[in-house]
Amino acid sequence: MIFSDIKRQVENIKKSDPAARNTLSIILLYPSIHAIFFYRIAHFLNNLHLYFLARLISQITRFFTGIEIHPGATIGKGFFIDHGMGVVIGETTIIKDDVKMYHGVTLGGRGNESGKRHPTVGSNVEIGAGAKVLGAIEIGDNVKIGANSVVLQDIPSNRIAVGIPAIIKEAK
C-alpha cells in the first residue's frame, strides 16, 4: 500500500506541479511525500493501539516537515500537500482519494467535543493555501476551496467555496 501510494502521489505531483523535475527529486525533496509516508506508518501503529509510538512518529515527522497529521486520521490514495508548511490534519479527519492542498491548511475541530469532530473531504478536492475547514462537516467530491477561506458548513459535490465565512458557489 505505501509504495503504490507513493507512486500515485508522484504522478499527481508531476501533473499538478510545474516545478516537479523528476521522480527522484520528488521522492527526496518533497516534504509531502515524507510526511505521508511516515503518516502511513504511524496510522498502521495507531490501528494496532500503539498510540504512543504512533504519536511519537507523527511529532518527529512534524518537526522535520512542518506538516502535522494525526495518526488517527484516515487518508486515501494520491494525497498531495504542496508547500506543506503549517498544515494540520486532525484525528478524526477523513480524506478520500486524489486530494490536493496547499500550505497553512487546517482540517480541524471547533472545540473539545469527543467523537467525530473533524471534516470528511471527498475525492478530487483542492484546498487553497491558508484555508480552514472546521468541524464534523462533509466536503463533497470535486470541490475547490479558495485560499484563506473558512469553511464551517457542508459543501455539496462540484462546488466552489470562497470567503470568510465561505460562500458556496456553483462550479463553472
Describe each region flagged by the PLM.
Residues 65, 70-71, 76-77, 82-91, ...:
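Left-handed beta-helix
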